[in-house]
C-alpha cells in the first residue's frame, strides 16, 4: 500500500479525499453547534454566476444563492475544489444549466449526497453547433436569448417552490416581477440592432456562444471555434474566418471576456476589420465590474455590438 501511494497521482487523489472529508466533518460540526442553524435560510448553489443572479432575483431575501464558479471564470472546463464539494453538499438545491455546458458537473455531482438538483434549460429548443468536433450537439448558451431567459425563470421558480414550498408565494411573486423586467429588454435591444444594415449583420466572435442572440436579432454568426475547449484559434480556424470576413466585407470582430483576445485581434489585423471589443457571455463580473447582473450583461453585450457597427 505504501509503495502504491508513491505514485504522484495517487498521492494527490488521497490528499484531495482527506481534505474534502475533513472539510465536510468541520462543516457538520459547526452546524451542530450553531443554535440558529434550524432557522437558516434555504440555500441554493448554482454552477455559474448567471444562473446565480437569475435565481437570486426569484429567491429575494428568503433564500441565499451562491455560485460554485466565481465572477469572470471560464465555466466550460472548470476544475472543482474540495471547498466546492463542501459548498454543494451544504445546499438545499443545486441549479445547473445542462446542454453540455458544465462538462465537469456530472462527475462532480457524483460526490454530492442527498441534495436535489434541477436543470434550468428544460423545455428550451436547442440550436445545434454547426461545425467542428461538437457539430450537431446543442449550443449550451441559451441564456443569451432574453426569451429563453423566461424559461430559465420558470424552471427556477418551479424548483424553488417544489423544494421550499413554505416560501412559494414569494417565489411566484418575484418570478413574475423579474420576468416583466426581462420582457422589457427586447424592444430597445431590437430597435438598436435594427439600425445596422441587414447586409452588415454578421456577428464574428471567438467562441460560438451567440447563436441564440444572433437568431433573435437577425445576425449571421461566424466564430473561430464552436465552444471554449482545448483547440482555440488554430491556423485552420483563423484562416476560415478571415476568408469569410474578406468575402462579405464584414466590418468588425469581437472576443469574449473569459478568453484571450489575441485570436480575434489577429483576425482584425489581417482583414482590416475593426476590433470591436469584449462581449460578455459565460460569466458575470464582480459587483463593481461592468456586468454584475444578467440584465446588465445582455445590455452591455448588445451595446458593444451596436457601437462596433457604428450604432
Curated annotation (Swiss-Prot):
Subcellular location: Periplasm
Residues that hold Fe(2+) according to the record: 76, 141, 207, 282
Keywords of the record: Ion transport, Iron, Iron transport, Metal-binding, Periplasm, Signal, Transport
One biological process term in Gene Ontology: cell adhesion
SUPFAM superfamilies membership: Helical backbone' metal receptor
Signal peptide: 1-31
GO molecular function, one term: metal ion binding
InterPro entries: AdhesinB (IPR006129), Bact_metal-bind_prot9 (IPR050492), Lipoprotein_PsaA-like (IPR006128), ZnuA-like (IPR006127)
GO cellular component: periplasmic space
Subunit structure: Monomer.
Written domain comment of the UniProt record: There is a second metal binding site (site 2) involving Glu-162 and His-163 which can bind Mn(2+) or Zn(2+). It is unclear what its physiological function is but may participate in protein-protein interactions with other metal- binding proteins.
Family named by the database record: Belongs to the bacterial solute-binding protein 9 family.
UniProt function note: Part of the ATP-binding cassette (ABC) transport system YfeABC involved in iron import. Binds iron with high affinity and specificity and delivers it to the membrane permease for translocation into the cytoplasm. Also binds Mn(2+) and Zn(2+).
Protein name: Iron-binding protein YfeA
Protein source organism: Yersinia pestis
Taxonomic lineage of the native organism: Bacteria, Pseudomonadati, Pseudomonadota, Gammaproteobacteria, Enterobacterales
Gene behind this protein: yfeA
Amino acid at each position: 500500500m505504501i509503495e502504491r501511494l508513491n505514485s504522484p497521482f495517487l498521492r494527490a487523489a488521497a490528499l484531495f479525499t482527506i481534505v474534502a472529508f475533513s472539510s465536510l466533518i468541520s462543516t457538520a460540526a459547526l452546524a451542530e453547534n450553531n443554535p440558529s442553524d434550524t432557522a437558516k435560510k434555504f440555500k441554493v448553489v448554482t454552477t455559474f454566476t448567471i444562473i446565480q443572479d437569475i435565481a437570486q432575483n426569484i429567491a429575494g431575501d428568503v433564500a441565499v444563492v451562491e455560485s460554485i464558479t466565481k465572477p469572470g471564470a471560464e465555466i466550460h472546463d472548470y476544475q472543482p475544489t474540495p471547498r466546492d464539494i463542501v459548498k454543494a453538499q451544504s445546499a438545499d438545491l443545486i441549479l445547473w444549466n445542462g446542454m453540455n455546458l458544465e462538462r465537469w458537473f456530472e462527475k462532480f455531482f457524483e460526490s454530492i449526497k442527498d441534495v436535489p438538483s434541477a436543470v434550468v434549460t428544460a423545455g428550451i429548443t436547442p440550436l445545434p453547433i454547426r461545425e467542428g468536433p461538437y457539430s450537431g450537439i446543442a449550443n449550451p448558451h441559451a441564456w443569451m436569448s432574453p426569451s429563453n431567459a423566461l424559461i430559465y425563470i420558470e424552471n427556477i421558480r418551479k424548483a424553488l417552490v417544489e423544494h421550499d414550498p413554505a416560501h412559494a408565494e414569494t417565489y411566484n411573486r418575484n418570478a413574475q416581477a423579474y420576468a416583466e423586467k426581462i420582457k422589457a429588454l427586447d424592444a430597445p435591444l431590437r430597435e438598436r440592432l435594427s439600425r445596422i444594415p441587414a447586409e452588415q449583420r454578421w456577428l464574428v466572435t471567438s467562441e460560438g456562444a451567440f447563436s441564440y442572440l444572433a437568431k433573435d436579432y437577425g445576425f449571421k454568426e461566424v466564430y473561430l471555434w464552436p465552444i471554449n475547449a482545448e483547440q482555440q484559434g488554430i491556423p485552420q480556424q483563423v484562416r476560415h474566418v478571415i476568408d469569410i470576413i474578406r468575402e462579405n466585407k464584414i466590418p468588425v470582430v469581437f472576443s469574449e471576456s473569459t478568453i484571450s483576445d489575441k485570436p480575434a485581434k489577429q483576425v482584425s489585423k489581417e482583414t482590416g476589420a475593426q476590433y470591436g471589443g469584449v462581449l460578455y457571455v459565460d460569466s458575470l463580473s464582480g459587483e463593481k465590474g461592468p456586468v454584475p447582473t444578467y440584465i446588465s450583461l445582455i445590455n452591455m453585450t448588445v451595446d458593444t455590438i451596436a457601437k462596433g457597427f457604428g450604432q
